[in-house]
Design a protein with these regions (language model features):
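Glycine-rich P-loop/Walker A and Walker A-like loops and their local beta1-loop-alpha1 context
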Residues: 1-46, 70, 78
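Conserved nucleotide-sensing/catalytic segment adjacent to the nucleotide-binding pocket
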Residues: 32-86
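Charged helix-capping and loop-helix junction motifs
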Residues: 116-121
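C-terminal accessory "lid"/substrate-recognition subdomains
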Residues: 139-181
Length: 181
């Protein structure tokens, strides 16, 4: 089975910078990484997956070592995740993809300005193994602490990372392989 990393987050949250950082720095040099963008957000992406009428259409693995699937940033995350689960059939013996990690990218200013977005993130974090905090420097530190508090208080089993102003993560391999404390 080919490992699949799923990226969640709204359009403009920093998903592209996170994907770039992971693709360039999370795996040993020479690994072939395939990027799967949702067809309507894909732009010039050579590969695409499609979410349509409640169904996910995901291409079969090729010769890549790992694939990164980016969900559509403007569509309902639960619907996409349920459709992906039905399509990928991770528990079935004939599954061709193995969901290795689910990563949410948080846009701090957007979440701070809109309570509904902050609640939307709670759904995403529920699914996630890792959370990348983006644009943290644009909001008060107290807001970030308050945002993270429920996850820390409830001992959410996911890792939290900061995406810096230059689009870097301190330890990219830990995002894909790290274990929560």
């Amino acid at each position: 089975m080919t490992p699949l990393i799923i990226i969640l987050g709204p359009t403009g949250a920093g998903r592209a910078a996170t994907v770039r950082e992971l693709a360039e720095n999370a795996w040993p040099e020479g690994r072939k990484i395939r990027l799967l963008r949702e067809a309507r957000e894909g732009g010039a992406a050579p590969d695409a997956w499609e979410f349509k009428d409640g169904h996910a259409i995901v291409p079969a693995p090729g010769d890549e070592d790992v694939a990164i699937l980016v969900t559509h940033g403007a569509l309902h995350v639960v619907d996409q995740m349920e459709a992906l689960h039905r399509t990928l059939k991770p528990m079935m013996p004939d599954a061709v993809w193995r969901v290795a990690r689910i990563i949410t990218v948080v846009d701090c200013p957007l979440a701070m300005k809109h309570k509904a977005v902050e609640e939307w993130y709670r759904v995403c974090v529920h699914f996630s193994d890792a959370v990348v905090i983006n644009r943290r420097w644009e909001v008060p530190g107290q807001w970030v602490s308050k945002f993270l508090e429920p996850y820390e208080k409830e001992f959410y089993p996911c890792l939290f990372f900061n995406l810096t102003k230059v689009g870097a993560i301190a330890n990219p391999p830990a995002v894909i392989d790290g274990e929560p404390l």
